[in-house]
Amino acid sequence: MGEPPPNPDPSQTRRASQGSERARSQEYSQPLLTIPEDGLNRPPPQRGSRSSQGSQDLQGTGLPHWPQRSSLVPDVQGDEGTEYHQSMPLGYTPGFPMEFSQQGYLDDSRMMEQFPQGQDLLEQLESTYQGSASGILGQLNLYPREDEIFSQDTQHGPYLRDDPSLHLRPSDLGFMPIVGEVPDPEPRELAIQNAKAYLLRTSMSCNLSLYEHLVNLLTKILNQRPEDPLSILESLNRTMQWEWFHPKLDTLRDDPEMQPTYEMAEKQKALFIRGGGEGEQEMEEEVTDSPVPNIMETAFYFEQAGVGLSSDESFRIFLALKQLVEQQPIHMCRFWGKILGLSRSYLVAEVEFREGEEEGEEEEVEEMMEGGEVLETHGEEEGEEDEEKVVDSVPKPQWKPPPIIPKEESRSGTNKYLYFVCNEPGRPWTRLPHVTPAQIVCARKIKKFFTGFLDTPVISYPPFPGNEANYLRAQIARISAATHISPLGFYQFGEEEGDEEEEGGAGRDSFEENPDFEGIPVLELVDSMANWVHHTQHILPQGRCTWVNPLQKTEEEEELGEEEEKADEAMEEVEQEVGPPLLTPLSEDAEIMHLSPWTTRLSCSLSPQYSVAIVRSNLWPGAYAYATGKKFENIYIGWGHKYSPENFNPMLPALIQQEYPSGPEITEMSDPTVEEEQALKAAQEQALAAAEEEEEDEEEEEDEDLED
């Protein structure tokens, strides 16, 4: 810091101070502060002395305590400011912010000049401030004063001695001259700008500034809200630095703009929106006549058995089914269950359209099938023309594909109901196509996990005729036929049908609810499986619920030639397939390796009178049913695979067929031996000699005839 400058002569200092006081007295109308004479002879304090020494001197004189401020530095420049600038020991440099300059301290003699005699300092300052504020200066002051910023209610400190905000300026004492110019911005604003500019300077080793680092650190603390941020401040600091110097590496897939969770939440918002413009009466009618099932009640009963989905998901499924009913002309709707997948799962809804609503869609499907048949016949004609051009025709194989089994009509058999699926509540519902017998037969021979995407091809052997949507529909038909059960007596056959059986031999295919059903006690439902029946038709090995003769000819097939008729007659007749009729008790189901196909239990064995009867399928794991009183329901939550006591063995490929039929034309003969060749040659010579002799004899006979 160096040695302090030599103290000026006390007499000169006293004369300069008296001259400045006389000049100020002529310009200001405010009374001057009297200076005690005993304070004039005090030597000035050395530079760098603590403020506590000055306070002790003031306490010794009995005067009021002066605030511990850094210095008395003027704020204005002009004629009066020249006197202050000449006193350079104060450490104030013109044109430079006061906060960044070295501030000096007034000596004791100068400080004692500011004290009044016989009057309290605070009272004198208050009267001086009120007088100056009422003048023109109060109108020209565009910036708030320090005493206005820091009110008496605000708690200050502790502050450092050299804090620029604590400097006692002459303006606070009422010595500010009246000037017409707009004052400069306060030093505090300049200090803030300079400090921020300093913090924004980037580091020498990276492009990161201290300001950005502190902002990120505070943002992270405010977002995470740790319990003790001070204890983990050091670790957070290291983590933030590591994140800056170790950016995220590039990935093969771009990060999604919106997380799947938020995207799903946005889609599910539409489920909670009520339709506007409807009265209370209309809403009541919709509640009573709506085909939407009571999913929450079903979930409550299955929850007692430890089965089902969460209450939140069940409610969202309820809203999704309500949305489906509003979009489609549905007469009956039911939540079938949930089939799990590797990537996404399927929520399945079993519905039945109102009469006449499905005819248009069936006609479109038939038109597409007819167009495909036309293309196939056109291709066959082109193939026949090519065969005529080729000289060596390729022999046709003797194998013939099995006859195509027609699928069952809508509202009957395996296609009695329609099924809609979606991956999550809020996503659009997709209608599954009708199932064909070939798809059901092939689905029994393969076992594939679902991926969650309906257009995924099913790669298997034997080849599955369709994609994942068709495979899903086939599995739904198989599970429904085997696991949909109800208490005995809940359904009954209609009186109009009678006891006549159809041609297929499957018996009755429809039933109705029994209005006189009063329910079966829970203990009886658990004790005997004869109190439960199947209310879904059994699927025959053919892939249909009603048997169809594949050899039965249609009108087009009767026009074929006699060759095809002979080939058909050579084939053996197919035996008719017969399955169990509707409403067959579960006690007649076949066992699985000496294992019962069903398991029954109570939801709570401690209170049987309030329990629910639960039935679980051992053949299709994930299929459950409950019954209590007049209520029952079925649900399936699983992977869509049938239980097999042994490991799954895929079907082996068929035997390789012969490319050409064996015959003498293509049979290779063995080479003859030498003896055989000689014998053959001798035989040929004898045959030639005999032929020549015969010719000669014939010629002689002809000559004789001519002579005669």
From Swiss-Prot:
Record-linked InterPro entries: Radial_spoke
UniProt key word Cytoplasm: yes
Tissue: Expressed in sperm and testis (at protein level).
Deleted gene: phenotype: Male mutant mice are infertile. Mutant spermatozoa exhibit shorter tails, misshapen heads and immotility. Manchette removal is impaired.
Disordered: annotated segments: 1-94, 376-407, 495-514, 663-708
UniProt biased composition (Low complexity): 47-56, 680-690
Highest taxon in the source lineage: Eukaryota
PTM (free text): Phosphorylated by PKA. Phosphorylation increases in capacitated sperm.
Keywords tagged on the record: Cell projection, Cilium, Cytoplasm, Cytoskeleton, Flagellum
Protein name: Radial spoke head protein 6 homolog A
Organism expressing this protein natively: Mus musculus
Gene: Rsph6a
